[in-house]
């Protein structure tokens, strides 16, 4: 092998191992914001519900304060709430829940959103939490809707639905006709294949995280371009760690989601958050969702699907205004 080829192989190897760094730098802004990380919790552990699903939870903040329960989105974990945790932890009791097959929760037994909502009701009973404010992002918002309209209807003070649709997720996103046409012949079989072959997809996910290819997709799927490189790598790393069979199972669960007939049953204050640059949940769908909620309000932000991280400083103030509104403090 010639010296030139050796240098090419070395360059390829370096790119495969560290490509995420230059790609994240090129795809991100230079804004000076605090890097996301892991904050210590006051207590943590696992709880198992009657469905057979086991959840990892972390609690933070003063334990006698108003509780806010955080439910993350698909292929994320409770770690996505870093900025919200730092902002709200001094004043509120915070509960961070990893969905089964995400973060530190083991694979789920049943990932239907109705089951996850019943599980949430059981978790609130186990933790002796009364009248929480439930804050759901994306998939977490779907569970929040099911909870507030059903098993948690008598044990919820308010809800926050951030970038979360009220019906089949492909109906409230970009290219709905194409995605719906591909769902049964392509996407569902693909997800079933991923569940059966997790080793291959875990390897693929790890390689794509290291070389930065997943950085590219996450930049356009989750952010508007004002995220920092550390934020982009942080979220991509969370996704790379999650078990692919768990993500596939959860994805199949939300493909059967529909709360359009139930949202009128939600009788508590609800803040619906949408974003101008969110390809996953269109702001127009948020307008309809708010119109169906008896106490709904709409906050539209100039951000992407992960505005809770990309523009956390501004968003946390807006969410805090809702949490401290007279409807929730009387």
Label the predicted regions.
Residues 130-175:
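Conserved hydrolase catalytic core segment
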Residues 1-68, 90-92, 129, 320, ...:
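Alpha/beta-hydrolase fold catalytic core
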Residues 266, 272-274:
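Short beta-strand/loop motif that positions the catalytic acidic residue
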Residues 156-202:
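Flexible "cap/lid" loop of the alpha/beta hydrolase fold
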Residues 58-106, 123:
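Conserved HGGG/HGGXW glycine-rich cap/lid loop of the alpha/beta-hydrolase fold
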Residues 280, 303-317:
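Catalytic histidine-centered segment of alpha/beta-hydrolase-like enzymes
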Residues 95-139, 143, 317:
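Active-site loop/oxyanion-hole signature of alpha/beta-hydrolase fold enzymes
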Residues 195-264:
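Conserved alpha/beta-hydrolase catalytic His-Asp/Glu region
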């Amino acid at each position: 092998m010639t010296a030139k080829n050796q240098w090419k192989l070395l360059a390829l190897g370096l790119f495969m191992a560290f490509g995420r760094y230059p790609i994240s730098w090129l795809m991100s802004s230079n804004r000076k914001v605090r890097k996301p990380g892991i904050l210590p919790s006051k207590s943590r552990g696992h709880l198992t519900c009657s469905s057979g699903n086991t959840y990892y939870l972390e609690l933070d903040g003063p334990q006698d304060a108003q509780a806010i329960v955080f439910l993350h989105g698909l292929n994320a974990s409770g770690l996505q709430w870093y900025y919200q945790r730092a902002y709200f932890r001094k004043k509120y009791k915070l509960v961070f829940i990893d969905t089964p097959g995400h973060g530190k929760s083991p694979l789920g037994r049943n990932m239907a959103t109705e089951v996850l909502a019943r599980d949430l009701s059981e978790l609130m009973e186990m933790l002796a939490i009364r009248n929480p404010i439930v804050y759901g992002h994306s998939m977490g918002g779907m569970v929040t809707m099911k909870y507030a309209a059903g098993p948690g209807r008598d044990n919820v003070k308010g809800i926050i639905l951030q970038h979360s649709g009220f019906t089949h997720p492909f109906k409230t996103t970009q290219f709905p006709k194409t995605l719906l046409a591909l769902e049964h012949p392509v996407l569902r079989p693909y997800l079933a294949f991923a569940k059966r072959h997790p080793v291959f997809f875990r390897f693929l996910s790890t390689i794509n995280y290291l070389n930065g290819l997943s950085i590219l997709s996450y930049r356009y799927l989750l952010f508007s371009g004002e995220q920092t490189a550390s934020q982009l790598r942080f979220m991509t790393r969370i996704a790379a760690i999650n078990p692919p069979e768990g993500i596939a199972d959860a994805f199949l669960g939300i493909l059967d989601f529909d709360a359009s007939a139930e949202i009128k049953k939600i009788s508590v204050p609800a803040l619906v958050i949408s974003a101008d640059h969110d390809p996953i949940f269109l702001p127009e769908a948020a307008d309809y969702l708010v119109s169906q909620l008896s106490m709904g309000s709409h906050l539209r932000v100039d951000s992407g699907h992960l505005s809770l991280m990309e523009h956390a400083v501004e968003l946390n103030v807006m969410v805090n205004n809702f949490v401290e509104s007279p409807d929730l403090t009387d």
